C-alpha cells in the first residue's frame, strides 16, 4: 500500500503537470469516483421480466394441449407427488415459506405463513378444511378461469398438497356460477383423479384420505370475500362475517379452515418439485415468483400471460400485448390490479414495476394483476363512474358506510360524467370515500373507494374542466 508521503508526492506531481489546484483536483477525483460507482451500480442492477419457457409453471395456459389427466401427466403434473407427501407436512410448509409466495388473490399475504396457522392437532368432531376461492368476479380479472379451463390438474394436485400440509380432510372449490364450462372441465378432471387413485381414500398411495368437491356460486361478487364464501357454502346468504374468529379457528361449519386463491394453490406442486429457492429467485425481494397477468383494454393483443414478478409495466404491455393502441404516448392511464385498485397516469406507468411493493409506493396495488389499459380516447370519469355503479350493485348492504356511501359515490361520479356538479363536490366525493374506507366488515368498501380516490388524485383537472364546460354550456343555452 502507498504510504502517506508517496501519496502527497503523487498529488503534487499530478497537479503540477495538469495545472489543477488542490481543490480542483479533489473535485475531479470525487467526480471520477462517483461516476465509477454509478457505472458499477448500473452493472449490478437486476432487470426483471423475460421469463423463459423452461421456468413457466402454467404450460397449457392457452389450451393448446390435452387438458385432462393424460396430457397433464405428460406435462409433469402428478410427478412423484407421493414422494412430496412422504417428506412430511413440516417440509412442505418450510419450502412454501422459503419460496416467498404471496397470495395471488389480491391481499398478498405470505402463503406458507397462512397455511401454518391451521391447528396442528385434529379430531373427528372438528375436521379441517381447505376452501379454494374460484369466485373470480373482479372486473378485468380472468386468470383463474384459464387455470380451471386449461390446467385443472395443477389445481387439484395443489389442493392435495396444500390440504395435506394443513391437515385438511377435504377441499371445497367454490367456483363462480357463471363459469359453466370451467366447472364441467374441473368436475371431469376430479373424476379422473379419483379413478386414478390420486385423491380419495388412499391419495397417491400414501394412506391419506382427501376429497375434493366443486361448489357452484350464484353470481354474487361479495362471495369472493372469504367469510361470505364460507357462508354461501353453508347455504346461507353470502354476507361477510365479523372477525375474529378467523377462518383458521372457526371457518366452514365452525371448523378450522383456510381459504386461498386458485393460482396460489396451483403453483404449489411446481414449487415443491423445483424448490422454494428456485421460485424465490424470480422477482424482487418480498415480491417473489412468477405471476399470471391478464391485460385488457386499449392494447393491440389482449392476453393472459405468465411473467416474472417485478416486470416493468411498459415492458409487460409492449412485449406481450403488442403495445398500446396508438402507441405508448397515446396512453392515458392504467388500472394495474383489477377494478378495486387506484388508476395510475402515464407518467407513473412509464417506470412502475408490477409487484406488490412498487405499486403500493405509487399508491395503487397489484391486486389480482388484472391490467386494464386506457388510452387517450378514454373518458376516465365515465370509466370510474362505471366501476362505482358495479360496486353499488354488488354491495351486500350489511354495513351502513358501504350500503349508503357507495351509492353516494356513484350518484356523484355519474353526474361528473356530464359535469353536472358543483366544484366543491369533488372534495365531498373524496371525503365520502375516506369515510367508507376502513369502516366496513369486509374490503368491498375499500374496493369501491380506491378507484374514486385515484381518479381525484391524478385526474382532478379533467373533472374541474368538465364542470366548467357544463356551466359554460348552461349559460350559453337559450333554455
Curated annotation (Swiss-Prot):
PROSITE patterns in UniProt: COMPLEX1_51K_1, COMPLEX1_51K_2
Cellular component, GO, one term: mitochondrial inner membrane
Recorded topology in the membrane: Peripheral membrane protein
Cysteine disulfide links: none
Catalytic activity as recorded in UniProt: a ubiquinone + NADH + 5 H(+)(in) = a ubiquinol + NAD(+) + 4 H(+)(out)
Enzyme class name: translocase
Subunit: Complex I is composed of about 45 different subunits. This is a component of the flavoprotein-sulfur (FP) fragment of the enzyme.
Name of the protein in its database record: NADH dehydrogenase [ubiquinone] flavoprotein 1, mitochondrial
Taxonomic lineage from the root: Eukaryota, Amoebozoa, Evosea, Eumycetozoa, Dictyostelia
